[in-house]
Swiss-Prot record:
Residues binding substrate: K63, N108, R109, M110, G111, F112, N169, N174, N243, T244
EC number(s) per entry: 1.3.5.2
Gene: pyrD
Cofactor note: Binds 1 FMN per subunit.
Role of this protein: Catalyzes the conversion of dihydroorotate to orotate with quinone as electron acceptor.
Organism listed in the record: Acinetobacter baylyi (strain ATCC 33305 / BD413 / ADP1)
Official protein name in the record: Dihydroorotate dehydrogenase (quinone)
Length: 334
């Protein structure tokens, strides 16, 4: 595809600039009617939703929902936008995004840079896309972690009518103390409060929107056991496994390999897939799983499915392989 020709030029730019330029080029191509990648339908029913195919876009590429229609032209079975926070925030200081091409890896410490939930809602309302849209929600960096539930409630209420499902992101390593919400009373309070509000909104709008949790790969067996118990207790609708890792296995001696932030791409594949397998074993098909982390070829998508995933998501693999990866993954999954 054309991406193989454009990639050397994009990789000559700073990663964040290349990210912005790629999205801009996609939007232009879409407006010109040049984005029509045909993907063979492979319907999957998950969380009460019928997905046209099981391969989705992970959150982080389109944080503000400004490129939904263009991304839809690539043939994803579903698109997840965000992470969004109640108020706009600029994120962490630049540089904060690093390519490690030798390992097909990326390190980011973006810090939930976004234009705020109100702008995202306006962008979603303006989009023509009528497919499956996930909206990923988080907390503002300056909100104390003990008040985090308030930020999640604000976002939940504002995006509820515009999302096919809503992802609660408590696993980014780039917002101080965010991962502490994955354990103990903090997780219990968060899930209990959000589930209660979800059910109230479902009754108010006569429309049920599934609630999904996104977790990190850096979890112990005890963590996995506890999180699983909480998911079942509060009847959370799905689990995304996993976010980026703090591990540097596979990139230790490479340029930028020791930059702070979350590592994604090929090196996280084994770790995230093992985490997925562990959750699948504990949950025993009681909650659907979405596998993400290190998918750079079709066989990786199959491995996620074999480990227990009903759906998969890709992001970093797209940067190295291009949109052909979507079709490859859909074709590989039987």
């Amino acid at each position: 595809m054309l991406y193989s020709l454009a990639r050397p030029m994009l990789f000559s730019l700073a990663p964040e600039r290349a990210h912005e330029l790629t999205l801009s080029m996609l939007k232009t191509a879409h407006k010109m009617g040049m984005l029509r990648q045909t993907i063979q339908p492979k319907p999957v029913t998950c969380m009460g939703i019928e997905f046209p195919n099981p391969v989705g876009l992970a959150a982080g590429l389109d944080k503000n929902g400004a490129y939904i229609d263009a991304l839809a032209g690539l043939g994803f079975g579903f698109i997840e936008i965000g992470t969004i926070t109640p108020r706009p925030q600029s994120g962490n200081p630049k540089p904060r995004l690093f390519r490690i091409p030798e390992a097909k890896a990326i390190i980011n410490r973006m810090g939930f840079n976004n234009e705020g939930v109100d702008q995202l809602v306006e962008n979603v309302k303006a989009a023509k896309f009528r497919g499956i849209l996930g909206i990923n929600i988080g907390k503002n960096a300056d909100t104390p972690v003990e008040n985090a539930v308030d930020d999640y409630l604000i976002c939940l209420e504002k995006v509820y009518n515009y999302a096919s499902y809503i992802t609660v992101n408590i696993s980014s390593p780039n917002t101080k103390n965010l991962r502490s919400l994955q354990s103990g009373d903090a997780l219990t309070e968060l899930l209990e409060t959000l589930k209660k509000r979800q059910l109230e909104l479902a009754e108010q709008y006569h429309h049920y929107v599934p609630l999904v949790l996104k977790v990190a790969p850096d979890l112990t067996h005890e963590d996995i056991q506890f999180i699983s118990e909480q998911l079942l207790t509060f009847k959370i609708d799905g689990l995304i496994v996993t976010n980026t890792t703090l591990s540097r296995e596979g990139v230790e001696n490479l340029p930028f390999g020791n930059e702070a932030g979350g590592l994604s791409g090929a090196p996280v594949f084994e770790k995230s897939t093992e985490c997925l397998r562990s959750f699948a074993k504990v949950l025993n098909d009681q909650i659907p799983l979405i596998g993400v982390g290190g998918i750079t070829q079709g066989e990786h998508a199959v491995a996620k499915k074999d480990a227990g995933a009903s759906l998969v998501q890709i992001y970093s693999g797209l940067i190295y392989t291009g949109p052909d990866l979507i079709k490859e993954c859909v074709s590989a999954i039987t």
